[in-house]
């Protein structure tokens, strides 16, 4: 293929981002990558098909990119990702402007499909489903140079009643430890300091290929890689957290004292309807254990409000939990009715207006909790990875903050500080979600 200009628009989660980065590497061999789709002759949209708002964003983006065939330089429109895997037949009819459609296991066909279309105009529509294939290999990072996401497993075995991911991504399958370590070593050589481990469920890592959960072993091995400073864990199911994992987080200085626990709900009756393999008592017990065993640990969660049949009593129970447990970070999603899931067939679907009201109530409550938690940080000194500048301030994150979702620490510019540096910052002021401080040195003690 001649050096044709290609742009890739990536939507959705960071697992999708990794797929996009894998595609970019393959494309870079024979194409010129451009950031602005208006300049591109080939536009690739990597879609999300998880919840209704994500699907709408994906459809709107595809249609916008399709319009560039008339208004700009686009000759080939490629659509891939979770939406194409989930709605392959419907999309083909709905958007005839698509020239190539790939499922989540078809990225190896990307270059060849583009070449064929440019040569003959022949369209390609692949949507292979695989319970064995794992997308891995070299990537072109779309994150800042000091941070990278690393997927340790693909798919999911949980089959929660509201979630379509197992039907899109297949059953849970772990990557081999040696492949992950090789990837981390390559990333560290590129200057990456923060490794963020992701999967649909990171805590189940290894169960399928090693016969047991070995996330703690993986953390230990990654921490030995030269250049890696921080290792962050996302998507840790509380019921799967082992004592070995707790010990590793506690004793390994490179592992951030931070856990993302997607509990979704707290009422046992709602958890049962959701098909979750846990209980209120188990969730509260593991939170207490983590706080007792790991000093200074930050706990984040995501909640779903408006699940079918959610009563005022069940919602009050959730509010009481949020108020009593006071998790450090919290996000709320309104339940999204997804085709093909058993929850979509449940009676007593909740009105959108009630969902919005409940979402707002939880977030107002959490805002107050976060404000109080942040006040306690005044005077504390943190290691901060410097991310950028806004007006006359630098900003960055400490171990308590995951990229893009957890707030930032702002501090005055310092001529000795560069983006990507890890420095010490003393907190002087606090806001609801952000902190303000000064570079910590002899003068700021």
Swiss-Prot record:
Free-text remark on how the cofactor is bound: Binds 2 [4Fe-4S] clusters. One cluster is coordinated with 3 cysteines and an exchangeable S-adenosyl-L-methionine.
Cofactor: [4Fe-4S] cluster
Domain of life: Bacteria
Residues bound to [4Fe-4S] cluster 1: 13, 48, 82
Binding-site list for [4Fe-4S] cluster 2: 156, 160, 163
Stretches assigned to the TRAM domain: 375-441
Example GO biological process: tRNA modification
Limits of the Radical SAM core domain: 142-372
InterPro entries (alphabetical): Elp3/MiaA/NifB-like_rSAM, Methylthiotransferase, Methylthiotransferase_CS, Methylthiotransferase_N, Methylthiotransferase_N_sf, NA-bd_OB-fold, Ribosomal_uS12_MeSTrfase_RimO, rSAM
Record-annotated MTTase N-terminal domain positions: 4-119
Keywords attached to this entry: 4Fe-4S, Cytoplasm, Iron, Iron-sulfur, Metal-binding, S-adenosyl-L-methionine, Transferase
Compartment annotation: Cytoplasm
Membrane-traversing stretches: none
GO MF, one example: aspartic acid methylthiotransferase activity
Keyword 4Fe-4S among UniProt keywords: yes
Enzyme Commission no: 2.8.4.4
Reactions catalysed, as given in the entry: L-aspartate(89)-[ribosomal protein uS12]-hydrogen + (sulfur carrier)-SH + AH2 + 2 S-adenosyl-L-methionine = 3-methylsulfanyl-L-aspartate(89)-[ribosomal protein uS12]-hydrogen + (sulfur carrier)-H + 5'-deoxyadenosine + L-methionine + A + S-adenosyl-L-homocysteine + 2 H(+)
GO cellular component, one term: cytosol
Keyword 4Fe-4S: yes
NCBIfam families tied to this protein: 30S ribosomal protein S12 methylthiotransferase RimO, MiaB/RimO family radical SAM methylthiotransferase
Protein family (similarity comment): Belongs to the methylthiotransferase family. RimO subfamily.
General function of this protein: Catalyzes the methylthiolation of an aspartic acid residue of ribosomal protein uS12.
Name listed for the protein in its UniProt record: Ribosomal protein uS12 methylthiotransferase RimO
Lineage of the species this protein comes from: Bacteria, Bacillati, Bacillota, Clostridia, Eubacteriales
